[in-house]
Amino acid sequence: MNRYVLEGIIRDAQAGKRILCVVPSREVQHIIDQLESASGIALLRRSHGDERVLFTSGGGITFAHARREAMRGHSADIVVIDDVYYLDQMFRLHADLKVIVAAASGEIITYT
């Protein structure tokens, strides 16, 4: 995840937004390492498969793999997808992720 995307999701989470990052599991710990220094963190969880960062504002960043079962039960204001990893699955992913952001009238953001 590049620093511009990271800065944006930190600001949104600090502002109370719920963000779901769809990234490969091998990237999650690296991203969390970069998030550690952000201000306003209430909880930083590194448990494999349950990684998340919650902010005092009520916002947070959770992580999921692109498998359907990994995304079940999530709701978010913003979904961020690294399309380099999931370009071949993008059509299916957008269909699955629309359900996650539907309740909040949120947005899906892809980046390379």
Where are these regions (language model features)?
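Short, flexible loop motifs at catalytic/binding sites
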Residues: 1-112
